[in-house]
UniProtKB/Swiss-Prot annotation:
The keyword Transferase applies. It holds the Pfam family OTCace_N. This is Aspartate carbamoyltransferase catalytic subunit. Carbamoyl phosphate binds at residues 70-71, 120, 150, 153, 280-281. PANTHER family: ASPARTATE CARBAMOYLTRANSFERASE, ORNITHINE CARBAMOYLTRANSFERASE, MITOCHONDRIAL. It comes from the Bacteria. It catalyses: carbamoyl phosphate + L-aspartate = N-carbamoyl-L-aspartate + phosphate + H(+). GO terms for biological process: 'de novo' pyrimidine nucleobase biosynthetic process; 'de novo' UMP biosynthetic process; amino acid metabolic process.
Amino acid sequence: MPTDAKRPLQLNDQGQLRHFISLDGLPRELLTEILDTADSFLEVGARAVKKVPLLRGKTVCNVFFENSTRTRTTFELAAQRLSADVISLNVSTSSTSKGETLTDTLRNLEAMAADMFVVRHSDSGAAHFIAEHVSPNVAVINGGDGRHAHPTQGMLDMLTIRRHKGNFEQLSVAIVGDILHSRVARSNMLALKTLGCPDIRVIAPRTLLPIGLEEQYGVRVFTNADEGLKDVDVVIMLRLQRERMQGGLLPSEGEFFKLYGLTEKRLKLAKPDAIVMHPGPINRGVEIESAVADGAQSVILNQVTYGIAIRMAVLSMAMSGQNTQRQLEQEDAE
């Protein structure tokens, strides 16, 4: 199954978003357009009636082959706020459990006139495979595929950073934890690099670091958390993904917390105004202590709010191209 989701598949002939599979190969201008569009949609969430008619008459189908309450719920809410009809497929009770292929399942859904699929799958490359096999008028959004990519999470993290820190050109950002199994880490590294962040630091035990990070993403790698966190502006903590680990990668969760967990004491190594992020779900006392997760520097709940706006931006842009902001302005004027 292919795992490389480069520009020709994701963009149409005019350079507008067609599918959203990975941040790899997407230009800085497009990522900025997504962030700007999401900024516009944040205002919609503050309205008494939290809806705009940009996707009225369209059907968005959430096809989650891997559980994720947060991602599925925010995609549902994003589609509903755009006035789309929403179908969420419970895969555990679907025909795939009876031996039906992924392609057959999607063909049946297409027969129901779905305009867009939001797909989450445990196999890397699944979203790319689906995008290659759907009808030309159907858009595919990757809700997370294996270790490969989680592009909307990457973009909501970028929106969080931009709203709290301004531009990216003078920031130091640390990504801490289970890098090896994290599609979020990969999407964040790609987004930060594309948006011009000059100092991307990756902090993890050697057993949880993929080979070749420095060359592929232009990051600095640290196995000592105290050294890596010194004077950073942003700290992104990652969950230990025990369900994806083979034995022997870690001595214990307690040992991991001792060496890499974000405590109040360790956070003081970062800049005084550093922000703390986490894609969730949080393992308190494993990668982060409660005093930090709930503290004044935490923007974890903001990430959830911004996630709805980012997903609204991606859904609307994939359906209508990069004129979403103009359409939204026209709706406001009427």
